[in-house]
């Protein structure tokens, strides 16, 4: 993997770049749709490629390890062949899912022991095993195993958690460098900065991560209950330390406004389930504001879903029709909303990139943040 900065904003920390992988280039800043179990919910691969114009998607180590399992994925020739996605894939290490989904989890120096949320079976994720699983998946970018403390953790717990994450990181990095890809394409390993909302812990973690010399770096443990301004402060602290010649990935964030503010602070890559999850519940994000498609106000609005929208569904379906589908609990409503929201998110980061290159990102971002947070 390689990364090149092609333009920077004179008034902010925003930058436009290109990540090169064996499965193609990624124009940054970029939003990555979440395909937890190897599929983005309610969206076909051809829609991701051709309509949404996704450049990279996510898979999740925890979920794919439990189901369908590594034997199936290996026999398929890796996740790219299994799900027919021929562009880059990033896999999360599964750490967040271990702590949020599984029962009877137990942290120890060796790794994270847990029971499957599917059948209650016992498992152990070690830093080394998580690398091996991601080798079997064949993702272009894999993540290090980390502990995922709540954003409201006290200082003592946050520091203890960070030290464990750092020890795990060293083991995972060593194992990554001692092993090879399985399917003939290169894989990158991203360490994760943790430290909750404590500036000294975030600084310590960012320095530790930067010194590792990985091909890219991630910022984790944010948007988990802390105030929004605290999240932005931590991004600023970390990005002052992380190297400028490596891509920076902010994990699990967020709203359109969050994404623009993260880009403003030097973030290159973002993912979140919000566009699909909220879409399935009738919330549409647009460049003019947020629409609740269950509201009665749309019942007789026969205008296109979004006349200047980024996807084909915006132009061929009316607001009244989509509202009817949601009220009738028709599955098609979820599909339309998911395609719309993802296409909007990809449009948004594409516009951010354009304005970084053109030199007017700051003024554009200020106006856009105000617009995308309106309730229509």
Language model: regions and residue ranges:
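Non-catalytic, usually N-terminal nucleic-acid engagement modules in DNA/RNA processing proteins
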Residues: 1-182, 296-299
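C-terminal extensions of enzymes
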Residues: 1-18, 26-33, 41-42, 146-152, ...
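Active-site pocket-lining/capping segments in soluble small-molecule metabolic enzymes
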Residues: 85, 90-91, 95-102, 108-118, ...
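Structural signal for hydrophobic packing residues in well-ordered secondary-structure cores
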Residues: 138, 169, 173-176, 180, ...
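Glycine- and acidic
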Residues: 151-155, 159, 216-222, 331-334
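Glycine-rich phosphate/ribose-binding loops and adjacent secondary-structure elements
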Residues: 163-166, 179, 186-305
């Amino acid at each position: 993997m390689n990364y090149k900065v092609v333009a920077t904003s004179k008034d902010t920390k925003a930058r436009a770049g290109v990540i090169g992988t064996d499965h193609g280039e990624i124009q940054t800043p970029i939003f990555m749709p979440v395909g937890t179990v190897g599929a983005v919910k309610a969206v076909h691969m051809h829609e991701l490629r051709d309509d949404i114009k996704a450049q990279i998607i996510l898979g999740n180590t925890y979920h794919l390890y439990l189901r369908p399992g590594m034997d199936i994925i290996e026999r398929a020739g890796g996740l790219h062949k299994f799900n027919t996605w021929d562009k880059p894939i990033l896999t999360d290490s599964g750490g967040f899912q271990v702590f949020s989904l599984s029962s009877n989890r137990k942290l120890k120096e060796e790794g994270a022991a847990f029971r499957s949320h599917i059948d209650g079976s016992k498992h152990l994720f070690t830093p080394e095993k998580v690398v091996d699983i991601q080798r079997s998946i064949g993702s272009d970018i894999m993540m290090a195993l980390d502990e995922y403390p709540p954003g409201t953790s006290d200082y003592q717990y946050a520091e203890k958690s960070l030290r464990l994450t750092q020890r795990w990181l060293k083991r995972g990095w060593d194992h990554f460098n001692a092993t090879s890809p399985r399917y003939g394409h290169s894989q990158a390993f991203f360490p994760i900065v943790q430290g909750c909302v404590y500036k000294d812990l975030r600084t310590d973690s960012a320095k530790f991560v930067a010194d590792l010399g990985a091909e890219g770096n991630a910022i984790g443990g944010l948007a988990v209950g802390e105030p929004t301004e605290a999240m932005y402060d931590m991004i600023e602290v970390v990005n002052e330390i992380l190297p400028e010649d490596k891509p920076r990935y902010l994990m699990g964030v967020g709203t359109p406004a969050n994404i623009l503010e993260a880009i403003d602070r030097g973030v290159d890559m973002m993912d979140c389930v919000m566009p699909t999850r909220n879409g399935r519940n009738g919330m549409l994000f647009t460049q003019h504001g947020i629409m609740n498609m269950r509201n009665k106000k749309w019942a007789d609005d026969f205008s296109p879903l979004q006349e200047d929208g980024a996807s084909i569904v915006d132009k061929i379906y009316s607001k009244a029709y989509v509202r009817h589908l949601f009220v009738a609990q028709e599955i098609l409503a979820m599909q339309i909303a998911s395609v719309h929201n993802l296409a909007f998110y990809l449009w948004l980061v594409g516009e951010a990139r354009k304005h970084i290159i053109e030199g007017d990102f700051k003024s554009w971002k200020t106006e856009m943040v105000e617009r995308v947070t309106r309730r229509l």
